[in-house]
Amino acid sequence: MEKSSSSSINPPSLSGDEIREAFINFFVQHNHQKLASSSLIPDDPTVLLTIAGMLPFKPIFLGLKESSTPRATSSQKCIRTNDIENVGRTARHHTFFEMLGNFSFGDYFKKEAIQWAWELSTEVFRLNPQNIVISVFKEDLEAEQIWKEVVGVDANRIIRMGAADNFWSSGATGPCGPCSELYFDFKPELGSDEIDLEDDSRFIEFYNLVFMQYNRDLEGNLEPLANCHIDTGMGLERMAQILQKKSNNYETDLIFPLIKAAALLAQLEYETTNKKNKTSLKIIGDHCRAVTHLICDGVSASNLGRGYILRRLIRRMIRHGRLVGIVQPFLPQLAEMAIELMKNAYPQLLEKKKIILNELKIEESRFLETLERGEKLLAEITSHECDLISGAQAFELYDTYGFPLELTEEIANEKGISVDINGFENEMAKQRKRAKEASVSIDLTEEGSIEREISLFDETRFEGYEKLETTSTVIGIFKNNESVKQAVQGDLVKIIVNRTPFYAESGGQIGDKGIITSQDLEVSVENVRKKKNIFIHSGIVNTGVLEINSSVQMNVTPSFRQRTTSNHTATHLLQSALKLSIDSSVSQRGSLVSNHRLRFDFNAPKPLTIKELEDMEVRINQWINEDHPIQIKTMPIKEAMAAGALAMFGEKYGDVVRVVDVPGVSMELCGGTHVTRTSQLGTFKIINETGIASGIRRIEAIAGPSVLDYFNERDLVVKELSKSFKVQSYEIVERVSSLQLELKDKTKELIKVKNDLALAKALGLASYAKSVGKSKLLIRRLDGVDGSGLQSAASSLIDHLGKYSAVIFGGIPNQEIDNKLVFVAAFSPDLVSDGLHAGKFISGVAKMCGGGGGGRPNLAQAGGSQPQSLDLALEKANENLTQQLS
């Protein structure tokens, strides 16, 4: 293949859509199957988001799955946030980007891949060969030879690179191989003598060809693969920059309309505004595409995993919007434009438009509520002459105001201030410790101190799928976390046996309960956990003597297992119902399966409606009545994933997995216990639905025998209420509503009485006001009055004292809660005109008592938590205000 004549080269200015279409069509003409982009939420539970064009094909490259076609081509949407600090600041970093790719699965190899890459670049996109530089792995002489002798590239334009740059691998072991990259040279007139591909002002990599030809073993040796593969990637945004002759990716038609729209909202001219504003506008444009696609693919904002990535991007958009002067909500408006820009390539954006705009509206509203307060605190911190934001300050911003640490760092860096990251991590660790200590309870399964000894035992053989009783040998006894030969009546013990029917706590399902017996021995088993497949049975010796090496009968309580099993199968049905009734993108975020109930956490942007919950109940109970069989299968993980089995993100799975299949209803990877037919569940009932974090909802439900218990308990409550209120059951709601209205009226009366008392008490203090120059100042401690009462009293005193008057109150509103203080400041209009500000003043007073607050210039309230400092704080307030009024 000869190089094209440079004189005939005139690269067309193609739109982003046209570039995508030209790439796909080129490879379709070369017998590649066109594949749609996969979701940003990958099937691989070990990966958070789709970060590369080849990720959907990873199971094929790793030999875990057969390809349905020998050749494929796609435009894959991707998200990366590892270089988020560079987004908007460099010409080519993005969070969202599209990777155009052509792939061979054991079909063609280097020669065809290289020839087609050159043909596409020079004949379809009509790039001048003089503008193209090739990199190859320094040991890949075959690829270098093809470039020189088959394609005809000048040897001076072929650069040999090391393994760090031009050798791809999927990990420490597995498929790998050299790669070759195509770079566009913006300044070919500089010649080929000293080419530095790291110079991104001159070169941009636009096409990467990976030749998967080796397998690396545990010793690091490279063995040739029986079938070699091709994996390529061309950045759509980069090719758009080249063909549209732009200085950076952001000014292409893929992103620039969003940037211009953001500039319009900020009342800025992008072309003439300063560099800082341009950076913020680029960040907004980039992130807008990312958040739109993330929500479309089912991600909801939260503080965990991919939900945290979405929340972080949304908050960065809002933050940079404010930096350029956009103070009103704007995300839905911009996302609507993003949908319009990308709807041809991704029509699902139109289908999910309502969901996308609603999620952005909710999340923007939430953040705006806290952002202003957080920004004020951060501004106050950085206004003082300091070069470091302490870990405690950064943590307060994170914990109280919802500021991600990265956002605090970004704002601080703009002001040339550092953030104490280690201090922040220490504060975070303290909070985790406090949370852990707050949840400590008596626990018979605290096996941490005996873990080393337990690890010496052979794995326990679990027989609980087939039976609830088995004869076993005691191979380990632990009492007070020490290994012993025997245990007697009353001893709390941990027991290890060679085989067991007891299910050990895992996968969200709690451990079984039951008894261990032999002759005079009886041990109550209260819980079972496992360490590396060694089952630890925790309980108490009721009678007899438990001895090492003795033969015992292991008995799981049948009713306990039945209830737990019913709730576990119901959990699978619930997840399927959620996907069908709410959205197919709903995914599990956590679960608990006990003998009493089930709990299922999932992503959702808003609470479920009563109708949605009712529809799911009806659907699940219909499945129960249809008496579906539950099929348990063990199969290779690649086979299970290919069949559509659901996997829990973050869980680690082996090569062979257990699949729980309700044909036509549900299929999940699961190691838990289940009923054999859905009819055994009897009935399913949702008892609660609530939010546990932003974007995360929780459903609590029951199935099987627990449903009857639930209705019996409710019936008892209704009867007790009927008896107490002396009404029929159907009259209870009306009676409670009447009492609530009565209570509301009485509460209003009580507040009025308290305010009247506070006012009378305060007016009695008017004589204590002192004259300071032409002003009157009253500062007093007033306990037993809440904030609203103090504000009312202070306002009345200002009216009573007249011009140039100031009133400061501080006190303990409730003597039963002596660590809560309230402060109020009121200034007359003339003092406000002279520059005094009640909000700022009272905030300073409250800080002396470990608190804070603020408000309007004429009236403000603050709080505190250190009553021992109250009197001193009021004295200081007197001194400061006297000095100001003088």
Swiss-Prot record:
Cofactor note: Binds 1 zinc ion per subunit.
Pfam family, one: tRNA-synt_2c
Residues given in the record as Zn(2+) binding sites: H568, H572, C670, H674
GO molecular function, a single term: ATP binding
Record-linked SMART domains: tRNA_SAD
Any one Gene Ontology cellular component term annotated for this protein: cytosol
Entry coiled-coil feature ranges: none
PROSITE patterns to which the protein is assigned, alphabetical: AA_TRNA_LIGASE_II_ALA
UniProt KW keywords: Aminoacyl-tRNA synthetase, ATP-binding, Cytoplasm, Ligase, Metal-binding, Nucleotide-binding, Protein biosynthesis, RNA-binding, tRNA-binding, Zinc
Cofactor: Zn(2+)
The EC number(s) this enzyme carries: 6.1.1.7
Class of this enzyme: ligase
Subcellular location: Cytoplasm
GO biological process assignments: alanyl-tRNA aminoacylation
Domain notes: Consists of three domains; the N-terminal catalytic domain, the editing domain and the C-terminal C-Ala domain. The editing domain removes incorrectly charged amino acids, while the C-Ala domain, along with tRNA(Ala), serves as a bridge to cooperatively bring together the editing and aminoacylation centers thus stimulating deacylation of misacylated tRNAs.
Sequence similarity: Belongs to the class-II aminoacyl-tRNA synthetase family.
Protein function: Catalyzes the attachment of alanine to tRNA(Ala) in a two-step reaction: alanine is first activated by ATP to form Ala-AMP and then transferred to the acceptor end of tRNA(Ala). Also edits incorrectly charged Ser-tRNA(Ala) and Gly-tRNA(Ala) via its editing domain.
PANTHER family from the UniProt entry: ALANINE--TRNA LIGASE, CYTOPLASMIC, ALANYL-TRNA SYNTHETASE
Protein name: Alanine--tRNA ligase
